[in-house]
Regions:
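Flexible "arm" and connector segments at domain edges
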Residues: 1-52, 56-95
Length: 95
């Protein structure tokens, strides 16, 4: 599935509810999901992937509310090369 397809899927399923909730509260839900992901990762729990999926879905919901096309933004930021060194694979020194 392409990024745009996933964004459209989330829009179809959740946009009405997201609009009623508003962007501020939806963003807070995103932060809550990031917290759940952090806890699961730190504890070595087996549902880290599920928490990542939740974070992605809530991030997409926020993008939909803000009118942001994530596929366009991702390709602008990461044009098939590292945005810092312009190489693929990245040749930046480790940070």
């Amino acid at each position: 599935m392409e990024i745009r397809e996933f964004q459209n899927l989330i829009r179809q399923i959740y946009m009405d509810r997201d609009q009623k909730r508003g962007s501020d509260k939806t963003f807070l839900w995103l932060l809550e999901e990031v917290g759940e992901l952090t806890r699961a990762y730190r504890r070595g729990e087996d549902h880290v992937g599920e928490e990542m999926a939740d974070v992605l879905a809530w991030m997409v919901s926020v993008a939909n509310l803000l009118g942001i096309d994530l596929e366009t933004e991702v390709l602008k930021k990461y044009p098939r090369v590292c945005p810092l060194c312009s190489s693929s694979p990245c040749t930046c020194p480790f940070r």
